[in-house]
Amino acid sequence: MQAYTGFAYVYDEYMDNIPYEEWCEYLVERLKEQGVTPDMEIADLGCGTGTVTQLLDKAGYSCVGIDNAPDMLTIAAEKLYESGQEIVYSLQDMRDFELPYEVDAMVSIADSMNYITSKEDITSVFECVKKGLKPGGVFIFD
């Protein structure tokens, strides 16, 4: 499932027209409705180059980004270095990931879940999400 190998280096340019700020505002509204407020911990599954992860961090959340594409995480790390933010990125597959600690919420946007095409794989994702969320935690995906 390494769909973005090589493409990572032009991904942000290609996705330049995407209203990430609006998406993040929408996510923050939904998270707050569920009691997940800034200062809480979020995991971003399929974080790619880290754009949404960085926006959530700027909104006050403590973030960890997970992606299975090394090139995408390389770009995310470069952007992180430039921004001075403190975000943990982890090279893992969303079908089989472990977090170092439970989080209050997980998000997966920009069609990341569309790459999960079998019933077994979607079950694996949801099992990992359940294991990684604190009791009462929230999972928002598109």
Q: How would you name each of these model-derived features?
A:
Residues G136-D142:
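Conserved beta-strand signature within the Rossmann-like core of class I S-adenosyl-L-methionine
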